[in-house]
C-alpha cells in the first residue's frame, strides 16, 4: 500500500465534497506559491519530448489532462502543470453564477473506483473565471468547458455569452451539452438543437471549439454529432461525459439507489468510452481531434486509447483514486511504449492500432 493509498483511506472518512474542498484548497495554495510550483514541476512532471505534440494549433507537452469538473472556477489554474498534467480543462462555466444542486450531491463508489455526482454546474460565473484566467502566471495549456445556466430559457444565448467572454482567454473551448445533472441539457445533443449552439460559438471566437458528448448516446446519434462536427469544422470531440447507466457495478444496487440520480465516472466507463472512441475514429478519421475520457486508470488503458485514435486523454476520478502517481505513471507508460515501438513521437502512435508491449 502506497503512502497515497493510506492517505486516501483517511480522506474517505470525510464527506466527498469536504475532501474536494480540502484538495482544492491545497492546490490553490500551490497555485499562489510560484517558487514551489517550479520545484514541483521539475520534480513531478514527466519531461519527455516524445510526448509533445501540436494539436489544433496548440502545443501540448504531454497528452494527459485534467478533465472538467474539478477546477470549476480556474482557482488553481497554475498548479495543474506543476503536479504533472499536460494541460487542464476548467469548468463547467455558465454565464451567471449558480449554486448547483442541493447537497449531498457527490458520492464515492470505492468498490468500482468510481464517483457519482449530480453537482449541477455549480460555479461562480464567467466573469469570475475570466478574472482568474487573466491573472494566471503559467503558460500551461488551459481549456474552458462551457454550459448553460439551469434556469435559462435561451441556451444559444448562454453559450454565445460565455464563449465570447472566455474564448480569447483559453487555448480551446468545449461545449458541454452532455451533463446529466442539468434538466434538459442532454436534449441539446440532438443535431437540430446542437447545430445553432455550435454555430454561434464558432462565430463568437477564433479559439478551437470542441463538443463533449455522453456515453449514453445511441450509435446513430454519435454518428450524427460527428458528422455535424466535421461539417462545422470543429476542432474535435471530447468523449465521453459521465453515464447514467448503473449496469455492471460492483457496489450493491441498493446502495447506489440510495445515492439517487447523477452521472457515474471512473472505471465503469472504460468499455463504453473506448467503444465510442473507436466509433468516432472510424467515422471521422483525422478530420477531428479526439479527446478520450472515462475509465483510463492504467498506462495500458491510456495506450489503448491513443492507438485507437485519441490524440489527447483526460481524467478526474482516476486522479482522486490514484493521485500524482497516476499522472506520472500514465505519461511514463506512454513514453515507454512509443520508444518500444520505434516511434519518434506520440503523433505517430495516434490511431495506429499498435498493441501494448510488455517491457
From Swiss-Prot:
It is an enzyme of class 1 (oxidoreductase). GO terms for molecular function: dihydroorotate dehydrogenase (quinone) activity. One of its GO terms (biological process) is 'de novo' pyrimidine nucleobase biosynthetic process. Keywords: Cell membrane, Flavoprotein, FMN, Membrane, Oxidoreductase, Plasmid, Pyrimidine biosynthesis. It comes from the Bacteria. It is a peripheral membrane protein. Pathway: Pyrimidine metabolism; UMP biosynthesis via de novo pathway; orotate from (S)-dihydroorotate (quinone route): step 1/1. CDD domains: DHOD_2_like (cd04738). FMN binds at residues 68-72, 92, 145, 176, 212, 240, 266, 295, 316-317. It catalyses: (S)-dihydroorotate + a quinone = orotate + a quinol. InterPro entries: Aldolase_TIM, DHO_dehydrogenase, Dihydroorotate_DH_2, Dihydroorotate_DH_cat, Dihydroorotate_DH_CS. Its EC number is 1.3.5.2. Pfam families: DHO_dh. Binds 1 FMN per subunit. The active site is at residue 179. Catalyzes the conversion of dihydroorotate to orotate with quinone as electron acceptor. Monomer. Belongs to the dihydroorotate dehydrogenase family. Type 2 subfamily. This is Dihydroorotate dehydrogenase (quinone). The lineage of its organism: Bacteria, Bacillati, Actinomycetota, Actinomycetes, Mycobacteriales. The gene is pyrD.
Amino acid at each position: 500500500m502506497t503512502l497515497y493509498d493510506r492517505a486516501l483511506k483517511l480522506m474517505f472518512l470525510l464527506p466527498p465534497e469536504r475532501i474536494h474542498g480540502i484538495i482544492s484548497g491545497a492546490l490553490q495554495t500551490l497555485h499562489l506559491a510560484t517558487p514551489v510550483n517550479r520545484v514541483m514541476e521539475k520534480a513531478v512532471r514527466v519531461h519527455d519530448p516524445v510526448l509533445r505534440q501540436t494539436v489544433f494549433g496548440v502545443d501540448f507537452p504531454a497528452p494527459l489532462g485534467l478533465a472538467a469538473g474539478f477546477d470549476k472556477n480556474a482557482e488553481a489554474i497554475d498548479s495543474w502543470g506543476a503536479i504533472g498534467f499536460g494541460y487542464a480543462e476548467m469548468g463547467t462555466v455558465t454565464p451567471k453564477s449558480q449554486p448547483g444542486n442541493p447537497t449531498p450531491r457527490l458520492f464515492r463508489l470505492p468498490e468500482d473506483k468510481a464517483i457519482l455526482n449530480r453537482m449541477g454546474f455549480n460555479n461562480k460565473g464567467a466573469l469570475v473565471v475570466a478574472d482568474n484566467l487573466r491573472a494566471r502566471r503559467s503558460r500551461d495549456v488551459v481549456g474552458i468547458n462551457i454550459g448553460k445556466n439551469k434556469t435559462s430559457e435561451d441556451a444559444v444565448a448562454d453559450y454565445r455569452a460565455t464563449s465570447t467572454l472566455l474564448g480569447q482567454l483559453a487555448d480551446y473551448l468545449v461545449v458541454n451539452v452532455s451533463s446529466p445533472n442539468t434538466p434538459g441539457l442532454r436534449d441539446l445533443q440532438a443535431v437540430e438543437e446542437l447545430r445553432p449552439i455550435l454555430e454561434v460559438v464558432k462565430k463568437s471566437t477564433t479559439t478551437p471549439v470542441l463538443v463533449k458528448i455522453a456515453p449514453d448516446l445511441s450509435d446513430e446519434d454519435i454518428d450524427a454529432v460527428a458528422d455535424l462536427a466535421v461539417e462545422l469544422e470543429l476542432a474535435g470531440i471530447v468523449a465521453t461525459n459521465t453515464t447514467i447507466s448503473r449496469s455492471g457495478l460492483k457496489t450493491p444496487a441498493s446502495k447506489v439507489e440510495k445515492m439517487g440520480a447523477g452521472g457515474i465516472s471512473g472505471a465503469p466507463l472504460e468499455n463504453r468510452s473506448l467503444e465510442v472512441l473507436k466509433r468516432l475514429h472510424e467515422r471521422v478519421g483525422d478530420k477531428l481531434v479526439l479527446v478520450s475520457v472515462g475509465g483510463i486508470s492504467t498506462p495500458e488503458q491510456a495506450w489503448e486509447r491513443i492507438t485507437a485514435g485519441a490524440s489527447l486523454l483526460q481524467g478526474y476520478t482516476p486522479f482522486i483514486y490514484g493521485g500524482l502517481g497516476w499522472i506520472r505513471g500514465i505519461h511514463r507508460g506512454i513514453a515507454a511504449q512509443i520508444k518500444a515501438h520505434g516511434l519518434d513521437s506520440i503523433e505517430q502512435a495516434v490511431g495506429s492500432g499498435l498493441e501494448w508491449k510488455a517491457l
